[in-house]
Amino acid sequence: MAKGYWMTAYREILDAEKLSAYVALAADAVQANGGRFLVRGGQMQPKEHAVAERTVLVEFDSYEAALATYASPAYQKALEALDGGVVRDLRIVEGID
């Protein structure tokens, strides 16, 4: 079974307090569903017209688990806390078997 991933590029952080609240809630939701943070901030070198302040990559045991975590009540609560505090691009993708 192919793994699932959340790939997130934060383009702009508008409210650091909202982001901090989101991070705490989202981390709990992700870990409760078996997600593992592979990249969480750190050094990066944007290329090919990329603009990013922060990058996050989360791995799940399956694509379905990645989708289910996003839809979970715990993660939806995290999104409510974020409430426009960032401009980002989050994609849920299926890995290669």
Identify the meaning behind each predicted range.
Residues 1-54, 61-71, 94-97:
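Short S/T/G/P-rich N-terminal loop/turn motif that feeds into the first structured element of a domain
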